[in-house]
Amino acid sequence: MLKKQKIIIIVFVALFVVLTILYFAVIAPLTKDDGEETTEPVETDVGESRTPQNYWLIFPQVEREDIKSIEVHNKYGTYKFYRNKEDKFVIEGFENLAYDQEQFSQLVVSTGFTISQVKVTENPTEEQLKEYGFYDDPAYYILTTKSGTVHKVIIGYKIIAGGGYYAMYEGRKTIYVLEKSLEKVVLAPVVDMVAPLVTAGIKSNEYFNIDNFKIYHHDKLFFAAQNLTSEELKERETTALVASKVTHPGDYTPSNIYDEVRLGLVNYVGDAVVALGLTEENLKEYGLSDPPYTITYNYKDDSYKLIASEPVDGYYYVGTYLFNTIVKVPEEDFKFLSWSLLKWIDNSAFQRSITFVASIKVETPQFTETFRLTHLDKSSNPNLIVKGDLCGVIDGSDEVYNFRQFYKSLLTVQIEGEAPLTDEEKAELIANDKRCILKFTVTTLGGNVTEYGFYRYSTRRCLLTVNGVGQFYVVIDVPRKIAGSAQKVIKGETIDPQEKY
């Protein structure tokens, strides 16, 4: 019996020791009051919230699909993106302007997800507001939701460490710190988000439909060209290099460079947009108040207009009326603006297929003759009869062949360069009949009439005029050869293509 009692006592002692250890090791620390305050949940201002990482959200996150508009004001100006009737975001006042979608997505994130790791202060003093940059027209943005909720956040100075910006929510006296990433969108000029398009809306395989192309130097027309009509195209089908004609400074054929320029203008993109709006202020800043260069053209039913500055540090500044912007363009891409007229004109001054010629009038100081052409057969081997006031009827194969040699001499008129004459000197020269070596006038079956004149101004050169307008010169041998060949036709003499005059 005694032994059994000892065992029970030992068990109770062991249990007491275990319970004592458990009390001091576990329970006592949990109930101990050491005088320290317990941690309470952090209070938030109305409209604020906390993220799972315990960061501040200045206002609840707004997703892209819930945004109605975002207005931004910074040192570069004010702009606004809004959702249009097609449910697409556009820039107010520049609705047809393309913009960088990635940049806009960053704007949505920066303005709709306002996360702040810290609150700098609450109820700031006037001195603190100045210190943190909330005076003197600070930057801000206004985000409006589809439901009509408006959030306005004001941006202050960059924090000393450079990792963010001080910010305040309008109507709330609390200063936060927002992430540095907002400087790339909210604090940047809107032009950084705009695609630097100069032209658009034309398919590259339809560049040849660009028509009524003109270049002005200041307000003076420098070069103009237009597409040939179907009738004109037939007249030049065997000789024309391009399906266009120059209309200024005269009726010439454009060089192949004209097509290259038209192709280059299709959907052209520059380096950067430097200004939105062709305002007087912007035009003055980029040398466009009195634009040195103006380009106009049509494409189907649309009209296009570009203005360009003089090149500055390797760039042109190009104002585009399509997008109402000024774009920085590499000088190399628009070098055609500085080209001389000669580069735009094909050297072959006369390009007509004889098949579509009705008559040729030749005038020299020695004679005047009109050759009237009758085309009996328009197959691949057409027959030709020529009647002249002096030469009579030309219908034999040898005589017709000889006449064709004369016609070939017209096709040899080659422009050599621009005549070094002033407008006054040209006018005086053209008015002097004694200086005219030759004129020939071609009338087509379609009724088009073109007169070519050759006026000697030096021992080796003649001013070439087309319908009375002169710009280029040819060597004097050219009109002499044409006149000599015409005279041989009149006299019935054989033309030697190699003969010099």
Report each predicted region and the residues it spans.
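Soluble, acidic/polar mature domains that operate outside membranes
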Residues: 2-501
